[in-house]
């Protein structure tokens, strides 16, 4: 078996818009042969991949409450965050959920329902969570490492998660809806790169496409 060197790679948190942007980029580039990589990672995994050069850039978000801590970690790793858009957090829940038709929700309204979230590395701070307001205590919570599993469990258990307002592909085929979350916290979505390094042509194309997707589907 011949190992082909990867010529372009992106690491990111578990957002489906990463996948769709990557697909759009590959299709636009075309070509008879290529070796690319798209890596779903924990927040620390995204930082490590970009800092080591394994990926050219990493897609992640920070909130108005976690930005200082996340940016400090990025700075220590020799990285910088480039914001593309701000968005409002939303509660993602199944179409059959009793709260699905609410005009807006608070986390108090969701206390009786299972909370699904993406598991982070054991020693990662709460600020590295992929969900806004992750530090709020929940009586029922389930950690997942896979996007499809999280979506399916939300439906099967009548649970919920807190996601971005970027609705493109949010259901992942699982039939999820989103409702605005009543909070002052804002999401800052963007990408991380190594300090002082410019993106290559493919990386810039990815970022340009990502920005268009985010602007098109963001909810405020």
What does each model-found stretch correspond to?
Residues 46, 51-73, 84:
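N-terminal segment of the mature folded domain
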Residues 42, 51-56, 61, 120-177:
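Hydrophobic hinge/microswitch elements
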Residues 69, 76-82, 87, 149-197:
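Beta-alpha-beta core module
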Residues 29, 177-220:
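A late-sequence structural motif
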Residues 18-23, 65-67, 107-135, 200:
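Secondary-structure junction motif
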Residues 2-49, 198-201:
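N-terminal winged-helix
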């Amino acid at each position: 078996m011949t190992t082909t060197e990867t010529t372009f790679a992106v690491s990111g948190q578990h957002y489906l818009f990463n996948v769709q942007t990557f697909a759009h980029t590959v299709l636009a580039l075309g070509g008879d042969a290529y070796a690319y990589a798209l890596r779903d990672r924990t927040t620390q995994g995204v930082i490590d991949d970009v800092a080591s050069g394994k990926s050219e850039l990493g897609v992640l978000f920070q909130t108005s409450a976690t930005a200082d801590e996340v940016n400090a970690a990025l700075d220590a790793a020799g990285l910088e965050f480039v914001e593309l858009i701000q968005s409002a957090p939303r509660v993602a829940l199944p179409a059959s959920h009793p709260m699905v038709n609410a005009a807006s929700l608070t986390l108090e309204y969701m206390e009786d329902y299972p909370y699904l979230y993406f598991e982070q590395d054991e020693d990662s701070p709460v600020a590295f969570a992929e969900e806004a307001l992750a530090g709020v205590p929940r009586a029922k919570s389930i950690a997942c490492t896979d996007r499809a599993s999280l979506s399916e469990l939300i439906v099967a258990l009548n649970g919920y998660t807190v996601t971005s307002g970027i609705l493109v592909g949010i259901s992942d085929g699982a039939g999820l809806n989103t409702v605005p979350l009543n909070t002052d916290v804002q999401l800052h979505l963007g990408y991380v790169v190594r300090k002082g390094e410019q993106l290559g042509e493919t990386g810039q194309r990815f970022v340009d496409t990502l920005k268009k997707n985010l602007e098109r589907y963001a909810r405020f």
